[in-house]
Amino acid sequence: MFTIQKPDTVSHLSHFHESKSLGSLPFPSDKERKQDTNFNILEETYDKNENWSQDKKGGEEGENKSKSEDEHSSLDNNRSQLKNRPIGQLKSTGSEGISLSSSEEEVRSPPEGAEIMQLEGDTPANDTANGFEKWAGSPLEDNGYASSSLSIDSPDSVSASTWQETTLPAPTTTPQENPETEDSDVESSSDSDSISVTLSEAFQSLQDKEKLKEREKEKHHAQLTMYRRLALLRWIRALQQKVRDQQNRLQESFDTILDNRKEMLRHMQHGYNKTPTKEAV
């Protein structure tokens, strides 16, 4: 699942690693010193965070019972607070719990050169549960950790409750059919039908009018052509009559010319016959 390896160098804890080891530090008293998860060097008596829940050498059983009762009460309070939290905060607190538990394991990890400690099998669930219980602060000595996500004993139960609350089915309302809407639908359908009928009739009438106009144009064109033909024929006949009249006039003039010629010849012959008789007398 998760593999936690202690880094070779820790930047934010450099002032602890650069100094001397814990065993070589001088202290005014001979009591046993221990190191908590916040890297605070304290005496055997603990007053904050997880230190109150750790076992003391030579402690009494009554104190352990009171501590367990305080843990249960703090867990109940934390559960009630977590129910009111949104899902995003639960996710962030879950990640914070994982990081803090990993820091606790780093404190307990072996020194440099040892093998990497792996959390596999049945141990991860127990270690994480113990880590959550140890990090839970008492209600009297709350330093900000009691209300955090480290006091969650079973994340599955909390996540199940929150998801059940958030994923409630939305109420679906079935639309009721009103008679007014039906009447309006019927009226709209009838109106659409009437509009379509009127449009079709108007289109048909327009087509008929266009056809009539075309027919009238064709008739007018035919009549115009016939009138033009008749006018042309009349003009031709008039020309023919004029030609005939001209021919008749020419014929008459020719006849008069012939008559005049005959008379002239006659007069000429009659005058030639008279002249020799006079000479003979």
From Swiss-Prot:
Transmembrane segments: none annotated. Residues 1-12 have a biased composition (Polar residues). The keyword Cytoplasm does not apply. Residues 179-190 have a biased composition (Acidic residues). It comes from the Eukaryota. Residues 198-257 form a coiled coil. The keyword Phosphoprotein does not apply. Residues 1-197 are annotated as: Disordered. Residues 45-74 have a biased composition (Basic and acidic residues). Residues 92-102, 147-161, 169-178 have a biased composition (Low complexity). Keywords: Coiled coil. Belongs to the UPF0500 family. This is UPF0500 protein C1orf216 homolog. The lineage of its organism: Eukaryota, Metazoa, Chordata, Craniata, Vertebrata.
